[in-house]
Amino acid sequence: MARIDSAVSSSQVYADGESSSARYTRTLSGARSALFTLLIAIALVFTVEVIVRWSWPDTVAYFADPMRPAWTTVAVFFLAMLGVDALFGREHKAALLIAPLAVVPAFISQQKQVFLSDPLYPTDFLFGRQIMELMPVLVKDRPWTAVGVVAGLIAAIVVGALLLRFAWQNFPKLTRRERLMRIAFALPLLVAFWNIMDYNQFSWIRDRLRVIPIMWDQTENYRHNGFALAFAINLPMANVNAPAGYMADAIDRIPVKPLPAGTTHRGKPDVIVLMSESFWDPTRLPKVKLTPDPMPTIRELQGGNVFSPEFGGMTANVEFEALTGFSNAFLPYGSIPYQQYIRNPIPSLATFFRGEGYVSRAIHPFQGWFWNRTAVYKAFGFDMFRSEENMPAMQKRGIFASDESLTKEIIRQADEVEDPFFFFAVTLQGHGPYEANRYAKNTIKVEGDLPEADRQVLATYAQGVKEADDSLKMLMDWAKERDRETIIVLFGDHLPPLNTVYSSTGYMKGITAERKGPKDQMKAEHETPLVVWSNKTGPKKNIGTISPAFLSYQILKQAGYEHPYYTGFLGKVYDHYRVLDRYMLIRKNGKDVADWLRQPKVPASLRDYRFLQHDMMFGKRYSTERFFKSHAELYSAGL
């Protein structure tokens, strides 16, 4: 009996030892798996930052700096992979899903910064269709990059499929207990992290993790926080909170300038506004000489400059300011009002002129869905939008409709209209990139010490400027023969994407403009020509440099109209400020105020400006009756 008890006891000790050994093995295996997942997370975050920053030292500095959240980002990726592995039921399978979701946007962001100044924002995916439409142009400009991208995508798909098959067959399975433990560990931490990422709310924990939302400077936001966290911070940018102090009483306290008694107009002049794509004065470039002058007409008539809030693209944001008299400075950085915010009727020059009995028409020789223009122009009150879909076929210069053919179409439509009209036209010929063989013959000679590729780009661009200038002269010659007063306004939407032409000539340090800098630098990188001309009174001079938001003030003043908002309120702001940019104010006297939005107190006129804009775009529209009565009457009548 004693021998039996001894045998049972020995067997129990052996079983306990075997169980302990198995637990140790499982624990060691789990630790190895977690460590490997952590290494994948580190490698993935490092790869993403190298791609976006395009700098090995800068990426190393990002990881080495204890004041930046590189390791917080690694922790988030680590937790995400643990959670996804638990869902799939196999170790490390999450890496095959998360890696491309992280690396592909990083590559897109790096490529975006080749053409524009900004990194990739979540809102950029709202206009993916626009990018695909322009893809042939981009491919033509950078064919080897396109070949590399396509080859890389094919290789990535093939490798991904092979890895997925290998993972499904060979990656270790997770037990039910292991899956539950991973979910229980990762999910609460990920949810907690997500809840502290609202940049509108201060978070002590987020601050300790070194995640600092820098919404007023997105370049610094991405540099400090890294691509993944900065991108995540920007996810709620479509939500616009009311500015502090916004309420009905605040709107009621904004004074309305009384309209002059018995205001008369000079026979209701016709108004044509031309926003010329990428139009700029290339003779500003140092170290080069262009002969003959590509823009003699505009140079003679130019009365000032528009300070564009954009560079090399994002035309719709400039257009938004020009038509509404509102400012991008009061909207989240990186937002695109045409894509995100214009969902309901908004006051604009179109509604003003329609209220005065005008035909109000938008004209653009491209597809109406681009930049959501069909819906936006309807919300702005245009009674017609003539686009590529419903206009006669346009003659092309390169792959875009020519300025000459668009001008002829404007003249044709104007001649058919008996009532006074307001036409807003957006040209297309000047759109970049500027491939060497766009035109069969360039008539502008480029002299100077430039690489041949840059010389060809500049010659192509200068030829487009010349043809835009010729088209304006054609329109003016037609207007001079008209009895009714005709006002023509032309301005460029932004500087062209000339890429290395800027750095080769020394005009800019890089190939894209800076978002912040001294006043002279900002003006050099954001000023485009402005012409305000009447067939009865000639050109308006000494306008200076103004934001697009003040164009409505200039147009109505030139036409002899008064309005509570466009000439009254904006006129009051214009009396003090000429440029209203997110990072800089330029006063009437030419003095600049940097980072004005970060000051403890914003000037009262700009505070009220923000209140009125928010009220009409996002708020309760308390200001409608006092500032935009004609807009309200137009829409109440169902027009």
Curated annotation (Swiss-Prot):
GO CC annotation, single: plasma membrane
Alphabetic keyword roster: Cell membrane, Membrane, Transmembrane, Transmembrane helix
Name this protein carries in UniProt: Putative cyclic beta-1,2-glucan modification protein
SUPFAM superfamilies registered for this protein in UniProt: Alkaline phosphatase-like
Gene3D superfamilies on file: Alkaline Phosphatase, subunit A
Topology class, membrane: Multi-pass membrane protein
Location, primary (coarse class): membrane
Organism per entry: Rhizobium meliloti (strain 1021)
Name of the coding gene: cgmA
